[in-house]
Amino acid sequence: MVNFTIDEIRALMDKPTNVRNMSVIAHVDHGKSTLTDSLLAKAGIISSGKAGEARATDTRADEQERGITIKSTAISLYGTLPDEEDIKDIVGQKTDGKDFLINLIDSPGHVDFSSEVTAALRVTDGALVVVDTVEGVCVQTETVLRQALGERIKPVVVINKVDRALLELQVSKEDLYQSFSRTIESVNVIISTYFDKSLGDVQVYPDRGTVAFGSGLHGWAFTIRQFATRYAKKFGVDRNKMMERLWGDNYFNPKTKKWTKNGTYEGKELERAFNQFILDPIFKIFSAVMNFKKDEVAALLEKLNLKLATDDREKEGKQLLKAVMKAFLPAADCLLEMMILHLPSPVTAQAYRAETLYEGPQDDEAAMAIKTCDPKGPLMLYVSKMVPTSDKGRFYAFGRVFAGTVRSGLKVRIQGPNYTPGKKEDLFIKAIQRTVLMMGGKVEPIDDMPAGNIVGLVGIDQFLLKSGTLTTSETAHNMKVMKFSVSPVVQRSVQVKNAQDLPKLVEGLKRLSKSDPCVLTFSNESGEHVVAGAGELHLEICLNDLENDHAGVPLTISDPVVQYRETVAGKSSMTALSKSPNKHNRLYMVAEPLEEDLCLAIEAGKITPRDDFKARARILADDFGWDVTDARKIWAFGPDTNGANLLVDQTKAVQYLNEIKDSVVSGFQWATREGPIGEEPMRSIRFNILDVTLHADAIHRGGGQIIPTARRVLYAATLLAEPSLLEPVFLVEIQVPEQAMGGVYGVLTRRRGHVFGEEQRPGTPLFTIKAYLPVMESFGFNGDLRAATSGQAFPQSVFDHWERLPGGSPLDSTSKVGQIVQEMRKRKGLKVEVPGYENYYDKL
């Protein structure tokens, strides 16, 4: 029985001050979906008996089988704060009434799917960060938290799996307190690293109620605020004073009936307030239930005035424990209260998020409407991903209304990522067929949706690839494109078993690239269809979807292949020169490597082609030691106008130079997209144009003359500058017990990996090993690792950086690198030998 109707939800949507949009983020297997279950049970969407095992937000069959979340799923819940006192505690925000609408998105934890997390974060304002008590803050916790803070999203923390610490590790109260406090400290360290002025201090403090402790599996959780409320009523003291005392170094002395900061009294140790007032009752319940002392349990229940249902009283052991703890500290109430009190409403959040969300000027009508979350302003809606419908081949567009109101039948401008105001490209004007409310795997039809809510749209999937902006204002710019922290580095090629199925495959590939924000599909010159993904697991899931859903035909799939990047190791040994086909124009160029930190700054979007060129020149001169005149004359970034290669104009007093600028830049984009060695993209090369000699007649220096010449001279300059290949490298974090560490080292050394850090988690027998592992060597790594450690090691790998491929020059066919290049060229259907620079270099 669902506890709310769609009409009630619709009524709440009109009060944006009472809406909370939040996503649940965490490391893999820290219990996001399990925690979400208890919230769903509270809202009556699933039965409370199932909560904790249903993982109701894992809607796909393969998610249930593998026990992992693959796609992020949205669900809307209805929550109330019955107590007037509580509503007064909502700091710095207005509220209207005591009913709240919570739009919750459960996101995956595997690093392969972190683009799903980005899509979820974009449409929410708050994040519930789940951390495992035993494992603490892991690599993926850090990644998702960094993504959240980058989107200006306010975090609150849940420390999950506390039952494990009590039942498996049998820790003492003080140890548990110390482990909590260590975990919270490491979360706060990450938060303070990415401090953002406009967001203010968002560190989490248990004594302010922004940290909850609990167990998703058993369905209980508490914040210090809840206990403070209980004791405040009992002892008649002020609740906020009580909250401060229940965390940190505060002790209650039962002899003098006073609070002190000093941990000893008359030579005896006093018990910390957190342990005495909060952990003690929990520990008592655990020991009474797990040691099967029926009478003690009954006494405790009476003391806490809890009434158990009749069938719950008959239970024993863990089942009884679950029932008692659920009655004593229900997780849903605790989490709902924390979200309502501490997460921002859309009205509050959009005021400071508008500048990071909107590309246009911050004072036009669209930006103002976003800042005030105005339902009457022009419609501004960002679609962050596509969700497949039950009807094959159609998609819901999933996004958030930032301003205005979206309704069925409304005519909107659908702006793709390359749209610029005033131009016609990447723009469609179409009517929205229906608006729906996303409820896990199902959808509920709804007439309209005001600003600040999360929505599904039907009928615009044909006009958007993966994400984009919907608006009714003709002057509105786009919402900023999402930055993904992973890049597709692993490829496999796909072929059909029966030739007549080819059209279905092509159609299927289109649908696949729609349904996943981070998958790339393209076909290369030899006619292969290639699918690229973020990692082995991601690719496996995508190809599975392709075969069974999107294309629905049997496929043959090649072995995984790694994407390389081409680069140079030194400066060109001589100036490269090329003549145009009609011999009237000459270009002179040299290539040299870019500094690694500059490449990273470009890839992270800190330095972009859209910056003001004077400001950019300042940064390049101050931080990277560039010559100021060079830094002002950067012609282009490539490939795709934003990659980490630069084209710099160093010419002096050349006639007609500006007329050929576009042609040279086109040639540069072409050359950097597919380099001379194996037609792989280039990275971290700086090309300097030294001199240009042009024909006086405009007709002899058109694009057809200049573009191929520019490409040839770029190739020659690259081949003269000690060309080499870069391979992608994963950062692997492995959690492993001490006795199995030898096996891990063995597997890593066999695969050219090197370990650069290991530390023990205090209070557990687990070690965390950090290592770099080339992507090329990572296929089948998980299986090997499990075999070597008999299943005790848990690896988590994420793309980290590019590294030069060792083993000789790519031009020498006998070396190791040369052989990789030959394989690559053979696969692409090119001549096997890498052409020498003579092919591109023209003598004077």
UniProtKB/Swiss-Prot annotation:
Keywords in alphabetical order:
Cytoplasm, Elongation factor, GTP-binding, Hydrolase, Nucleotide-binding, Phosphoprotein, Protein biosynthesis
Q: Name one GO molecular function term.
A: translation elongation factor activity
What range(s) does the tr-type G domain occupy? 17-255
| Localization per Swiss-Prot or TrEMBL | Cytoplasm
The record's comment on protein family reads: Belongs to the TRAFAC class translation factor GTPase superfamily. Classic translation factor GTPase family. EF-G/EF-2 subfamily.
- Originating gene: cot-3
Q: Which residues carry this modification: Diphthamide?
A: 700
Q: Which residues bind GTP?
A: 26-33, 160-163, 215-217
Return the protein name: Elongation factor 2
One record GO biological process: translational elongation
Q: What reaction gets catalysed by this protein?
A: GTP + H2O = GDP + phosphate + H(+)
* Role this protein plays: Catalyzes the GTP-dependent ribosomal translocation step during translation elongation. During this step, the ribosome changes from the pre-translocational (PRE) to the post-translocational (POST) state as the newly formed A-site-bound peptidyl-tRNA and P-site-bound deacylated tRNA move to the P and E sites, respectively. Catalyzes the coordinated movement of the two tRNA molecules, the mRNA and conformational changes in the ribosome.
Instruction: Give residues where Phosphothreonine occurs.
Output: 57, 59
Q: Does the keyword GTP-binding apply?
A: yes
List the Gene3D superfamilies hit by this protein, alphabetically: 3.30.230.10, 3.30.70.240, Elongation Factor G (Translational Gtpase), domain 3 (3.30.70.870), P-loop containing nucleotide triphosphate hydrolases (3.40.50.300), Translation factors (2.40.30.10)
Q: Which residues form a coiled coil?
A: none
Does the entry feature the keyword S-adenosyl-L-methionine, yes or no?
A: no
* Highest taxon of source: Eukaryota
Cellular component terms per the entry's GO annotation: cytosol; ribonucleoprotein complex
Q: What class of enzyme is it?
A: hydrolase
Pfam families per the UniProt record, alphabetical? EFG_C (PF00679), EFG_III (PF14492), EFG_IV (PF03764), GTP_EFTU (PF00009), GTP_EFTU_D2 (PF03144)
EC number(s) given by UniProt: 3.6.5.-
